[in-house]
Amino acid sequence: MPSPPPTPETATASDRTATPAPGMPILAVDAMGGDSAPGMVIAGLDIAAERHPNARFEVFGDAVQIDELVRLSKRLRNRVSIRPTTEIIPNELKPTAALRLRDASLRRAIDAVANGEAAGVISAGNTGAMLALAKIVLKTMSGIDRPAMAAIGPSARGDVVMLDLGANVVCDARNLVEFAVMGELFARTVLGLPHPTIGLLNVGSEEMKGDETLRRAAEALRESPIGPQFRGFIEGHDIAGGTVDVVVTDGFTGNVALKTGEGALRLVGDLLRRVFSANIASRLAYLLARPGLTRLREWLDPRRYNGAVLLGLNGVVVKSHGGADAEGFAHAVDVAMDMIVNRFNDRIRDDLGRHADRERLASDAFRATPPASATSVTTG
C-alpha cells in the first residue's frame, strides 16, 4: 500500500520543493552566513514572509538544521525550498579560497540566480567572498564597467543612498557616472523618491576642488539626462546633513565614510547612556526625555538600514550585516524584494540606454585618470 503524501507538518527538506506559481518573486538565501546562522536567517525570513506574502525562498545550507527551523514557522512551511549543501564559507576565509568551495551555501545561492532559479540572492556571510563570487558568477550587466556597493543611511532630511562602499578602491570618471546612474534609480526604487538629487563626494564644494577624475565625472553628469538632479560636489558633513539624496564616491572613500559614520553613531549612543546614568538628577531627566529618546533610537536603529546592495550585476545581490538580528535580516530581505518586484535591473538597462551610447561612455570625459595620489588635487 503506498504511503500517503507528506503534509506540511510531516514534509522533509526534500519534500518541500514545490514549483512556485508564475510571477512569484523568488529569493535565493544563504542560510549559513552570519554570526547566528541559520537560526537568525530563518527567523528573519519568517518576519519578511509576512510582509511579502507572494515571495518564495530557495534556502541553501544544512538541510537538517534548516528543516527543523522551518517546521516552527507556519508562514514558511509551504514557501521555502531547502537546497542541501555540504560546505560553508567562514568569515575569515580569503575570497580566492572561497572560489574553490563549489558546494558552499553562498556559492550555490549565487548559482541559483545565474541559472534563473531565483531573481536575487541574500547573505549575511563573508563580504569579500560574496563580492568575488557574485562578480565572477553573475558578471556585470552590459553597459556597466564595474558593480558598486550601495546602502541606505540616515540623514537630517530623511534617508540617503551612498555608493560605492568598498567594491572598487580606485575609480575613473566613467565608473563614477555609472554609479550615479545606478544610485539614482536605486533611490527611486527603494526610497520612492521621484527625482532624487545627486552629489559627488569631494574635499570641497567649489568646482575647481578635487582631482581630475572628479572634475571629469562632474562635467559628464552635468551634461547627462540626470543633470538637473546633479548638485555638484559635496563634502563629508553633507552626507549626514542630507544635502543630497544620493552620494557618489569611490569605494575607498565610501568605506571610510561609512565606518566613520557607524562609529559616530555608536559614540553618540554611549555618551547619552553615560549622561543619563551619571546621577539621580540625570536619571530623572531621562524619564522626562524618554519619549523623544525612544523616537531617536528608532530613527537611528541600524536594523532599519541593514542590506547593502551590489548594483550592476545580472541579478539582485544583497548583503546583510553579519551581526544582524532577525529584524535586521528581514529589512535586508525587504530591500531585495523591492528591487525584484520593481524590476530594478531591467530599469537600469533602460536608464543606461537613455544616458549615452558606448562611444560617448568611452569619450575623453569618461577616460580613466590616475588615482588622486598621482594627480594634482586642490583641497579646501
From Swiss-Prot:
Cell location: Cytoplasm
Pathway: Lipid metabolism; phospholipid metabolism
Region (Disordered): 1-23
Listed Pfam families: FA_synthesis
GO biological process terms, semicolon-separated: fatty acid biosynthetic process; phospholipid biosynthetic process
Keyword entries, A-Z: Cytoplasm, Lipid biosynthesis, Lipid metabolism, Phospholipid biosynthesis, Phospholipid metabolism, Transferase
Top-level taxonomic group: Bacteria
Enzyme Commission no: 2.3.1.274
Any one GO molecular-function label of the UniProt entry: phosphate:acyl-[acyl carrier protein] acyltransferase activity
Cellular component annotations (GO), alphabetically ordered: cytoplasm
SUPFAM superfamilies membership: Isocitrate/Isopropylmalate dehydrogenase-like
InterPro entries: FA_synthesis (IPR003664), Phospholipid_synth_PlsX-like (IPR012281)
Catalysed conversion reaction: a fatty acyl-[ACP] + phosphate = an acyl phosphate + holo-[ACP]
Quaternary structure, from the entry: Homodimer. Probably interacts with PlsY.
Matching NCBIfam families: plsX
The protein's role, per its UniProt record: Catalyzes the reversible formation of acyl-phosphate (acyl-PO(4)) from acyl-[acyl-carrier-protein] (acyl-ACP). This enzyme utilizes acyl-ACP as fatty acyl donor, but not acyl-CoA.
PANTHER family: FATTY ACID/PHOSPHOLIPID SYNTHESIS PROTEIN PLSX (PTHR30100), PHOSPHATE ACYLTRANSFERASE (PTHR30100:SF1)
Family of the protein in this entry: Belongs to the PlsX family.
Protein name: Phosphate acyltransferase
Organism: Acidiphilium cryptum (strain JF-5)
Lineage, broadest ranks: Bacteria, Pseudomonadati, Pseudomonadota, Alphaproteobacteria, Acetobacterales
